[in-house]
Amino acid sequence: MAVQRTFSIIKPDAVAKNVIGEITTRFEKAGLRVVASKMVQLSEREAAGFYAEHSERGFFKDLVAFMTSGPVIVQVLEGEDAVLKNRELMGATNPKEAAPGTIRADFAVSIDENAVHGSDSEASAAREIAYFFSATELCARIR
């Protein structure tokens, strides 16, 4: 198994519910280390740019509106097989289909307000991390 970095967003619905700490604790208990984290209020331009791959899909405008409706936490997580581990912790995109005990099953209310975003591949992680963080903002976590 290789040490990887992945990208995570704690979305506006979860921030509004004050479950930032509970979600981050789940990452850490699963062996993922936070190597960068910040709270940001996305502009329409930033949200549209981040989700540009979905720009032709019917839900794009609603997604951008939701992601700009309140602050989010953007994080870089590091650990063994971080991309897959984060995806497993999040659960299915639709919280009604998410396994019990996953972040989305516990904190999300709908497929639209589904608490978290996580990279789906190492390539996506690299692109998403670079979208929000400079190399100097990523901290080595040796211990």
UniProtKB/Swiss-Prot annotation:
- GO molecular function annotations of the record: ATP binding; metal ion binding; nucleoside diphosphate kinase activity
Q: In the UniProt record, which is one GO cellular component term?
A: cytoplasm
For this UniProt record, give its keywords in alphabetical order, as a comma-separated list. Answer: ATP-binding, Cytoplasm, Kinase, Magnesium, Metal-binding, Nucleotide metabolism, Nucleotide-binding, Phosphoprotein, Transferase
Q: Which terms under GO biological process does the entry name? A: CTP biosynthetic process; GTP biosynthetic process; UTP biosynthetic process
Swiss-Prot/TrEMBL cofactor(s): Mg(2+)
- Write down the superkingdom of origin: Bacteria
Tell me the SUPFAM superfamilies matching this sequence: Nucleoside diphosphate kinase, NDK (SSF54919)
Q: Where in the cell is it found?
A: Cytoplasm
Principal localization reads: cytoplasm
Residue ranges of the TM segments: none
Task: Report which reactions are catalysed by this protein.
Answer: a 2'-deoxyribonucleoside 5'-diphosphate + ATP = a 2'-deoxyribonucleoside 5'-triphosphate + ADP; a ribonucleoside 5'-diphosphate + ATP = a ribonucleoside 5'-triphosphate + ADP
Which residues participate in ATP binding? Answer: 11, 59, 87, 93, 104, 114
What residues make up the catalytic site?
117
Enzyme Commission number, as recorded: 2.7.4.6
Q: State its role.
A: Major role in the synthesis of nucleoside triphosphates other than ATP. The ATP gamma phosphate is transferred to the NDP beta phosphate via a ping-pong mechanism, using a phosphorylated active-site intermediate.
Assembly state and interactors? Homotetramer.
Which PANTHER family does the entry mention?
A: NUCLEOSIDE DIPHOSPHATE KINASE, NUCLEOSIDE DIPHOSPHATE KINASE DDB_G0292928-RELATED
What's this protein's family per the entry?
Answer: Belongs to the NDK family.
Q: Which protein, by its recorded name, is this?
A: Nucleoside diphosphate kinase
Gene field: ndk
